[in-house]
Swiss-Prot record:
PANTHER family: MAGNESIUM TRANSPORTER MRS2 HOMOLOG, MITOCHONDRIAL, RNA SPLICING PROTEIN MRS2, MITOCHONDRIAL. It is a multi-pass membrane protein. Keywords: Ion transport, Magnesium, Membrane, Mitochondrion, Mitochondrion inner membrane, Transit peptide, Transmembrane, Transmembrane helix, Transport. Forms homooligomers. Interacts with MRS2. The keyword Transit peptide applies. This is Mitochondrial inner membrane magnesium transporter LPE10. Belongs to the CorA metal ion transporter (MIT) (TC 1.A.35) family. GO terms for cellular component: mitochondrial inner membrane. The gene is LPE10. Signal peptide: none annotated. Pfam families: MRS2-like (PF22099). It comes from Candida glabrata (strain ATCC 2001 / BCRC 20586 / JCM 3761 / NBRC 0622 / NRRL Y-65 / CBS 138). The chain crosses the membrane at residues 316-336, 354-374. It is found in: Mitochondrion inner membrane.
Length: 397
């Protein structure tokens, strides 16, 4: 993106300099290259600053909020260098890829357990959990959001772990309390989003029961796409928890406080973190089931609408066929009337009942053609699957 911006700025500077050279003296024209390079550098710096303000990251820094072991905010909105973060906390450079590129909500979650830390990327929440520190990475657009402020307040209360009248002390270690706060915030956001999506979809489906319009179908299509994206996001988070619950060594390595104090856990000694993950896995599974039911209702409604539209289309086709049958039936009496009305001598005109006979023959031919065609049309309408298989068998013979 910087290369594109640099090319645009150079083109703008060249145009400005080309226009200005039309009124320059020869001495002044000699200094245009220096002015052009200076203007290009200034514009490039301004564009870099503008991009940093828009996307919330610098060339080598990451903005974050740091909590200490007591749950207090040490430094809000602190810019930490990427190299310093990797070297100080024992991370790999690729571990920060999702955090650096998280300009929007990430669909794919990640849960990385390292030697002395846990790196979590869950929807809009991206944190690094250590046995005595929590680093919350502030993504673009989340600094002033209500959900981000609520998450920071909830995380602060759980990390402080004060013994109050309404809230007792939590026996879980520091890192598990941080994880629980992350899951609670993520689940509350997912639940709120699910309630909004479900309410909108139910309202559209109820409106479609009374009238089917183009605007409602278009709105239902857009809402179905949003619901599908939300369903994918919840399924990915649930699958991530499934993978974690199946890896006993990873669960044991999540006891950061015990590992710091020299206490190692065996493969089957991870009941606390397993119960914690299973609890939120069940909540996520409930959200997934509700979303699946709504998606199935939307698909069922779409199928019913398609059936209704096909039925209406068939009715229009039948109406056109009936008009065609009527026009075909009118051909019989018209033909007889044209013969009777020819300016030729015939015995019909000499009789007293010629006109009545011609009219009767025309009406009889009209009725015969009409009822014969309608009878065959009804046979085609009442054709069942059994009749179709017998017809296909007869054709093969």
């Amino acid at each position: 993106m910087l290369l594109v911006n640099r090319a645009i700025t150079l083109n703008l500077v060249k145009r400005c300099c080309w226009r200005s050279t039309m009124f320059m003296t020869p001495k002044r024209f000699l200094g245009t290259s220096e002015e052009e390079s200076t203007a290009a550098l200034l514009l490039q710096k301004n564009l870099i600053q503008r991009n940093n303000m828009l996307y919330g990251h610098g060339s080598g820094t990451i903005r974050c909020t740091v909590f200490d072991a007591g749950g207090n905010i040490v430094s809000p909105a602190l810019d930490i260098k990427r190299e310093e973060l990797v070297a100080k906390h024992g991370l790999l450079p690729r571990d920060l890829r999702k955090i650096e590129k998280s300009r929007k909500n990430d669909l794919v979650p990640s849960f990385l357990v390292r030697k002395n830390g846990i790196l979590v990327s869950l929807a809009t929440i991206k944190t690094l959990i250590k046995p005595d520190m929590v680093i919350v990475f502030d993504s673009f657009g989340s600094l002033n959001s209500t959900s981000h402020k609520a998450f920071l307040n909830s995380l602060k209360l759980r990390l402080q772990n004060l013994d109050m009248v309404e809230l007792k002390k939590d026996p879980l270690p520091y890192e598990f309390r941080a994880l629980e706060s992350i899951f609670i915030s993520a689940l509350s956001n997912l639940t709120s989003e699910m309630n909004v999506q479900v309410t909108i979809c139910k309202g559209i489906l109820q409106d479609l029961e009374y009238s089917i319009t183009r605007d409602k179908l278009k709105f239902l299509l857009g809402q179905n796409k949003k619901l599908s994206n939300f369903y994918k996001k919840t399924v990915l988070i649930r699958d991530m928890l499934d993978d974690l619950l199946e890896q006993s060594d990873v669960l044991c390595s999540m006891y950061l406080s015990d590992l710091k104090n020299g206490v190692e856990h065996k493969d089957d000694d991870h009941s606390e973190i397993e119960m914690l993950l299973e609890t939120y896995h069940n909540h996520l599974d409930e959200i997934v089931q509700i979303t699946e039911n709504i998606i199935s209702n939307v698909k069922t409604t779409e199928e019913i609408i398609n059936i209704i539209l096909d039925s209406n289309r068939n009715q229009l086709m039948l109406l056109g066929i009936r008009f065609s049958i009527g026009m075909l039936s009118l051909g019989g009496p018209i033909f007889i009337g044209s013969l009777y009305g020819m300016n030729l001598e015939n015995f019909i005109e000499e009789t007293d009942y010629g006109f009545i006979a011609a009219s009767a023959i025309g009406m009889i031919s009209l009725g015969a053609l009409y009822f014969y065609s309608i009878k065959h049309l009804h046979k085609l309408q009442k054709m069942s699957l059994f009749n179709y298989t017998n017809y296909a068998r007869d054709v093969k013979k």
